[in-house]
């Protein structure tokens, strides 16, 4: 299945595919997705957890004990907790954000949805997210799952990647275009 989806490749793709197949067999695809989304939110909210996940400085034992404590305190159990512990034991926890993204793509494909990566300067309101989903659904004819990333560097606007298509309506890109046009004119 990983070979059929270009966004699901490499080490993270193999782990995501294995997790997806296990979750599908256990009929827990949505529960695992919800857990992974919660873990991703925890990473976004905690620089310490992000450092623990990404830094090769921590020993496998330290990383394993710390992650077990975090998962226990956050109430993670079952397939997702076991999977995150396997990633840790295999020294692949640093790939977890890519695994979460790839797992989301597999779930979307399984449900017949399209997945769009959206980059914004500030978090979008639920109203704006719904409007964006509706607009993308009218283009694709499918329900669209959004992977929203906040990047203040784009200044404003948004960048949408859907399959092989990309629409960049960020303020940064527009300002760069004006800058280049002025250089050519001057």
UniProtKB/Swiss-Prot annotation:
GO cellular component, one term: plasma membrane
Gene Ontology molecular function: proton-transporting ATP synthase activity, rotational mechanism
Assembly information from the UniProt record: F-type ATPases have 2 components, F(1) - the catalytic core - and F(0) - the membrane proton channel. F(1) has five subunits: alpha(3), beta(3), gamma(1), delta(1), epsilon(1). CF(0) has four main subunits: a(1), b(1), b'(1) and c(10-14). The alpha and beta chains form an alternating ring which encloses part of the gamma chain. F(1) is attached to F(0) by a central stalk formed by the gamma and epsilon chains, while a peripheral stalk is formed by the delta, b and b' chains.
Family of this protein: Belongs to the ATPase delta chain family.
Membrane topology: Peripheral membrane protein
Main location as per UniProt: membrane
Compartments it resides in: Cell inner membrane
Protein name: ATP synthase subunit delta
Keyword entries, A-Z: ATP synthesis, Cell inner membrane, Cell membrane, CF(1), Hydrogen ion transport, Ion transport, Membrane, Transport
Function as written in the Swiss-Prot or TrEMBL entry: F(1)F(0) ATP synthase produces ATP from ADP in the presence of a proton or sodium gradient. F-type ATPases consist of two structural domains, F(1) containing the extramembraneous catalytic core and F(0) containing the membrane proton channel, linked together by a central stalk and a peripheral stalk. During catalysis, ATP synthesis in the catalytic domain of F(1) is coupled via a rotary mechanism of the central stalk subunits to proton translocation. This protein is part of the stalk that links CF(0) to CF(1). It either transmits conformational changes from CF(0) to CF(1) or is implicated in proton conduction.
Keyword Cell inner membrane: yes
């Amino acid at each position: 299945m990983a070979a059929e989806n270009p966004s699901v490749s490499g080490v993270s793709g193999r782990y995501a595919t294995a997790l997806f197949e296990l979750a599908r067999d256990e009929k827990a695809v949505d529960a695992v997705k919800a857990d992974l989304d919660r873990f991703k939110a925890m990473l976004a909210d905690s620089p310490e957890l992000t450092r623990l996940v990404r830094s090769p400085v921590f020993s496998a034992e330290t990383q394993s004990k710390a992650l077990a404590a975090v998962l226990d305190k956050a109430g993670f159990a079952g397939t997702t907790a076991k999977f995150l512990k396997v990633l840790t034991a295999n020294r692949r926890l640093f790939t977890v954000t890519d695994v979460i993204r790839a797992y989301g793509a597999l779930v979307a494909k399984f449900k017949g949805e399209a997945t769009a990566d959206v980059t914004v300067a500030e978090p979008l309101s639920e109203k704006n997210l719904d409007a964006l989903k509706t607009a993308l659904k009218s283009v694709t004819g499918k329900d669209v799952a959004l992977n929203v990333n906040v990047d203040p560097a784009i200044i404003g606007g948004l960048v949408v990647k859907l399959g092989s298509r990309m629409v960049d309506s960020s303020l940064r890109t527009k300002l760069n275009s004006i800058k280049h046009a002025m250089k050519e004119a001057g």
